[in-house]
Amino acid sequence: PIGKSHPSLSADSGLQFPLDASTGKPIPFRCSGVGFGFRSRPVWEAMAQNPPPCTDLLIEHRCVFALSCMDKLVSHGKRLAMVNINATPCGRRGRNTDVKLDTLEIGKDAVVASVASDDQALRQHILDMGLTPGTEVTMMKYAPMGDPLEIRLRGYELTLRKDDAARIELVGIHDTDTGPRANAAIGTTEHPALGEGTYSPRAAKTAVPEGAPLHFALAGNQNCGKTTLFNQLTGSNQHVGNFPGVTVDRKDGTIRNHPEASVTDLPGIYSLSPYTGEEVVSRQFILDERPDAIIDIIDATNIERNLYLTLQLMELDRPMVIALNMMDEVTANGGAVDVNLLESLLGVPVVPISAARNEGIGELVDHALHVARFRERPGRLDFCAPDGPDGGALHRCIHGIANLIEDHAVTAHIPVRFAATKLVEGDELVTEALHLDRNELDAIEHIITQMEGEAGTDRLSALADMRFSFIGDVCGRCVVKPHESREHVRSVKIDRILTGRYTAIPAFLVIMGLVFWLTFGVIGAALQGLMEDGIAAIIASADAGLKAFGTNDVVRSLAVDGVLTGVGSVLTFLPIIVVLFLFLSILEDSGYMARVAFVMDKVLRRFGLSGRSFVPMLVGFGCTVPAIMSTRTLPSEHDRKMTVMLTPFMSCSAKLPVYGLLCGAFFPQATVPAMVSLYLIGIVVGCVAALVLNRTAFKGDPVPFIMELPNYRLPSVKTTVMLAWDKAKDFITKAFTIIFAATVVIWFLQTFDIRFNVVADQSQSLLAGLGSICLLYTSPSPR
């Protein structure tokens, strides 16, 4: 109550809200002692769970942060008065608002005060990842080479480089609270009429006829189980392609037992802001192809972060259902989610599932078909409170812009709320699509500038804060999070070795050495030998059969030496490709590949690359084809192109026989050292080429390294096998075409002479003639 200290506050951090007798409203508060609420998270959790019976004052973590760091009193969402905070803020003696994230000690907690960056797109991406002012972060560790660093926020781990972390100011530095915390119990909430056509007040009056084609978009964050869910939905009824105009993978499939329902697996993203190609592709797919419904998969172990994308998907105003994945982990760790209350607050159906265990998939499909047939759009599109801490400034801003651009948005087939929000963000793609004139653009900029002045913050921070505030309120009412999950505890223990300062690189060498040995020396080599024997037997049988049939020698040679030999040369690579991708899929699904990028980022950054490029180049020592194919997973076009151009410098296993032949001929006394030197020369030349390219064709700032580090998980056998098979099919359909065509061309050149007569002696063939021409320019001059 006003005028009283909350009982959960310690004696040295009493907080009082005196009442103004004339107005009946709170006046500037008094704070005594050190700590002021930041020292201990339970203080604010207790206040959230047991709020004071007072309607005049809204108490929130970020509200108190604003009071302590910006000297403002917030009540009814308005700044009533300026106050001086005499207490030492944030649990540390002396002023500490100049501390940067890159200098935070390991094991310390702090609160984000501000996020700065010259690159507004990068700054928005950082905010979208949850690093908003008022967010508590914990420094987990630094990479073995000192850069990048790993922090924990909003229940997950995030990595970023020191250069980017240096732009993030912190306050409230204190030791991490590792003690157990009691979880408040949540009840159950009845939700009426779900699945009966009356759930959403915005449903269509007439349903789509039974059996009519329906198309779904599957969206979600990275590492939330989206691929596993897609495989459960479609089984083997899927194919892989590209989104138009980009190299981003597109997976389409048909939902099992529902031949009329197809689904597209969109790339894993964290936001619909145009920071990455995947984000642009995902939102353009929804806007342009207008799927009948969106299936949004959420990691139930980290609802807070995942809901950030959910709110943006809801703004697209398409029928939608939420798949709350990994609920088995939540309950196993003592957590709980009031699913009915969650879907009531969001206005969309929520279905708890476990994709890995194939639990709840049938119910999810039923709900998805229902919202698609009845066109049940989200019941809520507005997430900013009119009486929020910013005084409703953002609410008025978005609604004012929405009224101004409504006609343009309808013409451009863009949802009005989504368009208004993106204009506040400064989204150039949406601005161009709306075709606004100069007067309208000036009016919109004036509205946004006025909002920034009233809210006391910039536009990007205001939007991110609005979404996370709504999410925090929702999660506070219907989610009980365990203090620490078993998966996270296990991951921390494993990371002590796999990302440890002195053990990370040796562990990496051991793991990749084992993968290469099993691929090229044991499993892959054995399967390749069996494949070669089988192909040789098929070619011999075909040759004998064609001879017995009396087939023309040229036709027989084309079939045997051209077609079958060409196909065989491709297929002999297949066992290596499958086994290598199988191991890489296991490492990726387990979460280890993200750690490799974290460990190696500092080395590759010197050459203009990020740590994600290390694994494709390493795979290049085994086989260049799968190495180049694996670059498609890199998030940056800059990284993809650079990695593709540098990977061939890593000598693959197919070059080993050639190296052996040349070294044996020219260096008979030192064959092994000569072969090793060829590998080293290739690496050195690749590094030099990277430096040259980074200063010429790919000149510019290095690509930021902002990446989530997921918990270690046991890979799904089904998902891993299907991923390896997809890569194998990709190899067959792409590399096969080139290699097969090259084989046929070589057969033609070595079979015919310049008059297109069949040659008995290949020294008279076209191929020999081309070799003679090359010899003129490559043979040493006579002494």
Over which residues does each language-model region extend?
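Juxtamembrane inter-helical linkers in multi-pass membrane proteins
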Residues: 537, 596-618, 700-722
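Conserved G1/Walker A P-loop phosphate-binding module
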Residues: 198-264
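Alpha-helical membrane segments and immediately flanking helix-loop junctions
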Residues: 608-656, 663
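Conserved small/polar residues in nucleotide/adenosyl-binding loops
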Residues: 777-782
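Switch I (G2) and immediately adjacent beta-strands of P-loop GTPase domains
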Residues: 243-293
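Alpha-helical transmembrane helix bundles of large polytopic membrane transport and channel proteins
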Residues: 321, 331-483
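Conserved C-terminal guanine-recognition region of P-loop GTPase G domains, centered on the G4
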Residues: 285-289, 293, 297-349
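Transmembrane helix-loop junctions at the membrane interface of multipass transporters and ion channels
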Residues: 653-675
